[in-house]
Amino acid sequence: MVADANGSSSSSFNFLIYGKTGWIGGLLGKLCEAQGITYTYGSGRLQDRQSIVADIESVKPSHVFNAAGVTGRPNVDWCESHKVETIRTNVAGTLTLADICREKGLVLINYATGCIFEYDSGHPLGSGIGFKEEDTPNFTGSFYSKTKAMVEELLKNYENVCTLRVRMPISSDLTNPRNFITKIARYEKVVDIPNSMTILDELLPISIEMAKRNLTGIYNFTNPGVVSHNEILEMYRDYIDPSFTWKNFTLEEQAKVIVAPRSNNELDATKLKTEFPELMSIKESLIKFVFEPNKKTEVKA
C-alpha cells in the first residue's frame, strides 16, 4: 500500500483518464501503476455526453483527468485547416467533460496550454515578469491557441476544474517525437527565444498530488524561469552528442515556413511553487530529469 503526502493510502484513489493514445495520457497511466493507484482509461468520446456518463457510472472514479485534445499532426498548423475537428474536441469535448464532472461532484484535472500568451510591453522578453494565472490571454495567432483561450475562459465558471497550463513539454524520453527537445533537434533551423517550459518527469507526479489535494482553479504548470532554444541545444550537445550542430533563424524567417505564428512567453510559476516548494527551476530540472539520465558524454565543468 502506497501512502501519499497527506497520509491517505493510494488504494483510496480511483482515476479515470482521458487521452489513452496521447503522450501525457500514456505517462499518467505509468505513474499510476508505479504509485499503486487504480486507474482506467475512458473509452467515451469527449463530445459524446452519454458515453462519458457511462464511463463515470462504470468506473466510479475519485478523480477525472483530461489529457485528450487535438494539437495537430505534425504540429498546430493542422488545426488551421481542420477548425471544426479542433473545436469538437478542444472546446465542445472539454466543456462536456467538465460539465458532467461538476454534475457528479468530481474534480477534473485538465491539462491545458500556456501557449495563449506572448511577450508584450507589460511582460517584456528578458524582464523576468511572467504572466500570472489571472491574466487575460493575449495570443490568438493560431487557431489552436484561440480555442484553448476560449475554453479556459469558460472553464473558470466550473469550480470543480483544475486547469494546468502546460508549455513546450519535455520528458526524459528523447525518442518521443512530441518531446520539445526532440522536435527542435530535428528542425533544419530554430528560433532562439527564452520560454517557460514543462518538464513532465517532474510535473506530472505533481499533477497527481494536486488531484489528491483536490486543488482547483488555474495553475501555470511550468518550471520556474525560462530557457532558450539555444541553451537547450547546447545542453543536448554537451550531454548527448558532441558533434551536434544547429542553425538559427529569425521570427520573420520562421513565419515564411509555418502557417500560424507560435506563442513565446514567460509564465509566473509562483502559485505552483508556493503549493510545491520542492519545484525546481527549468534549467535545474532539465539537467536532473532529462540530460543526466541520458548522458552519453563527460560534461565539461
UniProtKB/Swiss-Prot annotation:
What does the entry list as the binding residues for NADPH?
Answer: 23-24, 69-71, 111
Q: Does the keyword Nuclease apply?
A: no
MF-aspect GO terms: dTDP-4-dehydrorhamnose 3,5-epimerase activity; dTDP-4-dehydrorhamnose reductase activity; UDP-4-keto-6-deoxy-glucose-3,5-epimerase activity; UDP-4-keto-rhamnose-4-keto-reductase activity
**What EC number(s) does its UniProt record assign?**
1.1.1.133, 5.1.3.13
Q: Name one GO biological process term.
A: cell wall organization
Reaction catalysed by this enzyme = dTDP-4-dehydro-6-deoxy-alpha-D-glucose = dTDP-4-dehydro-beta-L-rhamnose; dTDP-beta-L-rhamnose + NADP(+) = dTDP-4-dehydro-beta-L-rhamnose + NADPH + H(+)
What Gene3D superfamilies has UniProt attached to this entry? NAD(P)-binding Rossmann-like Domain
Q: Which InterPro entries match?
A: dTDP_dehydrorham_reduct, NAD(P)-bd_dom_sf, RmlD-like-bd
Pathway membership: Carbohydrate biosynthesis; dTDP-L-rhamnose biosynthesis
Tissue specificity, please? Expressed in roots, leaves, stems and flowers.
Q: How does activity depend on pH?
A: Optimum pH is 5.5-7.5.
The record describes the protein's role as: Bifunctional enzyme involved in dTDP-beta-L-rhamnose biosynthesis. Catalyzes the epimerization of the C3' and C5'positions of dTDP-6-deoxy-4-keto-alpha-D-glucose to form dTDP-4-keto-beta-L-rhamnose and its reduction to yield dTDP-beta-L-rhamnose. Can form UDP-beta-L-rhamnose from UDP-6-deoxy-4-keto-alpha-D-glucose, but cannot convert GDP-4-dehydro-6-deoxy-D-mannose to GDP-fucose.
What name has this protein been given in UniProt?
Answer: Bifunctional dTDP-4-dehydrorhamnose 3,5-epimerase/dTDP-4-dehydrorhamnose reductase
Species assigned in the record: Arabidopsis thaliana (Mouse-ear cress)
